C-alpha cells in the first residue's frame, strides 16, 4: 500500500478550489477544517486562517452545501476537522445526516475525549461517516491499545506534544510509539502536527502509513503562486512514493 498523503485546508470560501487542486496532485485524503472561534488545538497559522474564514462568511452550512454540490467531481476522500461545539450546536444527528449527504469520509473531533468518542460512535453507528481517533505520543501503551482497538478509518498520531505547526524536533520516542500503534492497529496509522518538508516526511513516513500536513499547506496556500504550491504538493507525493 502506498503511503497516505493527507493535507489540511481551512474551510474558507475557496476551499473547494484548494480541495480539487490537492486531489488532482496526489492527496489521498483531504482534511477540511471547520472555522471556529475558539480553536484550542490549532497553531497560529491555522488559527489566523480560521478567523479569516469566519470574517469572510464561511461556516459549516457553507461547507456542507459546497461539498454536496461538488462531491461527484472530487476523487479523493475528505474528512472534516471540527470542534464538538459546532457539532453540538448544529445537532448531532442532523450533522451526521449532512456528512452522509456530503460524502464526508470521516470526522476528527480533537476536543472529544476517547470515552465520549466511543459513546458517540455507539449512539450513531447507523451513519457511514467514520470517527477518526487521535493518539498523543504521551499516551501509555495500555491507552494506545484501548484506543486502537476501537478506531476506524485511520489513526492520527500526534507527533509532538504541542499544538499544530509548532517548529522544533519531533518527539524522541516517536518511531517506537508509531511502530507500537501499528502493531496493535488493523487500520492505517498516520502522523501529523509539525510536518513541513520532504525531509520530515521521509523521516516520519519511514515508519508511519502516511502523513498529515496542516500549517505548512495553509501557509503556502496564502503566499505561494499556484505553480509553486503544486510543485510543493508534488514533492511531498514523490517523497511518499519513494518509501
From Swiss-Prot:
Gene: trpA
Domain of life from the UniProt record: Bacteria
Keyword Lyase among record annotations: yes
Positions of transmembrane segments: none
Residue numbers annotated as active site: 31 (proton acceptor), 42 (proton acceptor)
Catalytic activity: (1S,2R)-1-C-(indol-3-yl)glycerol 3-phosphate + L-serine = D-glyceraldehyde 3-phosphate + L-tryptophan + H2O
One annotated Gene Ontology cellular component of this protein: cytosol
Name used for this protein in its record: Tryptophan synthase alpha chain
Keyword line: Amino-acid biosynthesis, Aromatic amino acid biosynthesis, Lyase, Tryptophan biosynthesis
Organism placement in taxonomy: Bacteria, Bacillati, Bacillota, Bacilli, Bacillales
Subunit structure: Tetramer of two alpha and two beta chains.
Amino acid at each position: 500500500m502506498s503511503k497516505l498523503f493527507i493535507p489540511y485546508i481551512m474551510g474558507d470560501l475557496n476551499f473547494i478550489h484548494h480541495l480539487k487542486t490537492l486531489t488532482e496532485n496526489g492527496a489521498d485524503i483531504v482534511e477540511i477544517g471547520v472555522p471556529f472561534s475558539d480553536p484550542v488545538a490549532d497553531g497560529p497559522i491555522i488559527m489566523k486562517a480560521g478567523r479569516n474564514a469566519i470574517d469572510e462568511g464561511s461556516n459549516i452550512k457553507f461547507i456542507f452545501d459546497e461539498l454536496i454540490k461538488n462531491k461527484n467531481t472530487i476523487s479523493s476522500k475528505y474528512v472534516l476537522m471540527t470542534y464538538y461545539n459546532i457539532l453540538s450546536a448544529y445537532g448531532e444527528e442532523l450533522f451526521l445526516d449532512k456528512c452522509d449527504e456530503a460524502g464526508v469520509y470521516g470526522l476528527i473531533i480533537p476536543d472529544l475525549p476517547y470515552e465520549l468518542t466511543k459513546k458517540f460512535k455507539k449512539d450513531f453507528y447507523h451513519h457511514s461517516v467514520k470517527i477518526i481517533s487521535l493518539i498523543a505520543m504521551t499516551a501509555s501503551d495500555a491507552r494506545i491499545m484501548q484506543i486502537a482497538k476501537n478506531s476506524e478509518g485511520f489513526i492520527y498520531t500526534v507527533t509532538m506534544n504541542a499544538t499544530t505547526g509548532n517548529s522544533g524536533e519531533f518527539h524522541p520516542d516517536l518511531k517506537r510509539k508509531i511502530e507500537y500503534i501499528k502493531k496493535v492497529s488493523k487500520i492505517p496509522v498516520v502522523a501529523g502536527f509539525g510536518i513541513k518538508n520532504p525531509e520530515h516526511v521521509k523521516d516520519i513516513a519511514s515508519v508511519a502509513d502516511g502523513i498529515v500536513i496542516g500549517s505548512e499547506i495553509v501557509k503556502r496556500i496564502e503566499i505561494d503562486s499556484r505553480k509553486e504550491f503544486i510543485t510543493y504538493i508534488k514533492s511531498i507525493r514523490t517523497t511518499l512514493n519513494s518509501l
